[in-house]
Amino acid sequence: MKTKFKHILVILCLSMISCEGNLEPELFDQITPENFLTNEDDVKTAVTGVYAEFRGISEWGRYKTSWGSVMTLQEVPTDLWAANWFYKAHTDFMWKATDYFVCEIFEFFVPAITKATALIARIQDAPVSDDIKNRYIAELRVVRALWMYDLFDLYGPVPAITDPEKILNPTQDFTVTRPSREEYITFVENELKEGINDKILPVAWTGSDYGHVSQATAMMVLLQLYMHEGGYCRNKHVGDYLDYFKKAEQVAKDIMDLQYYELQAEFKDIWSPQNQHNNEIIFALPSFPIPVMGNNFLAHVLPTDYKSQQGIPLTGWNGFRTPWEVYDSFD
C-alpha cells in the first residue's frame, strides 16, 4: 500500500512539473508592443498621453499662465501684457540660453514631438479600423504641428524628429540636426494643410471630445504661421511678405466661412464665468478642480485684496496684467 501511494505521489509531482514547464506567464504590469495598441481603447489611451504633454505633471502647466509657459513667453515681451514679477530681461526679450524659464519649453516639447511621431507610426500598424487610425493620426499630426510652430516662434527651427524610422529603429551614428528655416516651415505648413483638406477632423469637437484639435485648430495655427513669416520677411527685407499676408487673409476668411466661430459681442464677456465653450474659442485645454488639471489664471491676475461678488476673499498674486492702453482699445 505504501509503495502504491509513493508511486501516485511521484506521478502527481511529475505532472505538476510538466504543467509548469508549459505555462507562459501573462504580465499585467508591463506594456509591450505585443500587449498594447491592440484595440481602440488602447489607441485612445496612448493619444491621451500625447495630449497630456500640453499640461505636464504639475499645476504649473506648459500652456497656462505659469512663469515660463508658452503663453507667458509669447505674450509678456509684447506691449499687450505686463507682469509684476518678471525679470526685466524677460519683458525686454533679452533671453539667455542659461535661463531655465526660457529653455524649458524646448526641453518639454522636442521630446513630445518625438513621442507623437512614434505613436503615429505605431497606430498605422495597430489592428484597429481605418476610421480610428485616420482620426487619431490626423489629430496627432495637427498637435505635432502646433507644438512645432510654438517652438519655432520661440527658438526658430528646432531639431525635431518627424521620421518614425529614426525613433523606432535608431542607428548608432544618427544625430539630430537643426533644419533650415524653409524646410521647417514647409513641413509644418504641409501638415496643417493636410489636417484641413483631408476633412477627417470635424470643424469643432463637442461633448467628451471637447479639447481635441480640429480642422479649425489647424487653420488657426496656419494663420499664425503665415502672419509670423510675413512679419519676418518684412522686417528682414527678404522674400515676399505680402504673399504671406495674403495667405493669412485667406485662411482667416476660411475660418469665418465655417460659420461656426464668432467673437464675443461684448469685450467684457470674455471674462464671464458663463462663457465656457463659447464659439470664440477655437482650441481649448479644459480645466477641472483636480490636481494638475486646474487653472491658476485668476490667482495670477487678481490683486491681493480682491473679493468675489459674494464678498469671499480670493487668492490673488497681483502678477500679470494688461496695460490700460490695450483695454481701452476695445472700447
Please provide the spans of the model-predicted regions.
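Bacterial Sec-dependent N-terminal signal peptides
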Residues: M1-D29
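Secondary-structure transition into beta-strands, especially the periplasmic turns and strand N-termini
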Residues: K4-L9, D125-R141, K246-D254
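An aromatic- and glycine-enriched ligand-binding surface/loop that stacks and positions planar moieties
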Residues: E20-A83, T162, I185, K193-I200, ...
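Short linear capping/connector segments at secondary-structure termini
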Residues: D29-T32, A97, D163-T171
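Conserved, well-structured interaction surfaces
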Residues: K44-T48, A52-S58, W81-Y155, F174-T186, ...
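Short, flexible active-site-proximal loops enriched in glycine and acidic residues
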Residues: Y155-I161
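Solvent-exposed loop/turn segments at secondary-structure junctions
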Residues: V158, K166-L168, F288-I290
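Short helix/strand-bridging catalytic loops that position acidic/His residues to coordinate divalent metals
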Residues: N169-V176, G207, K236-D240
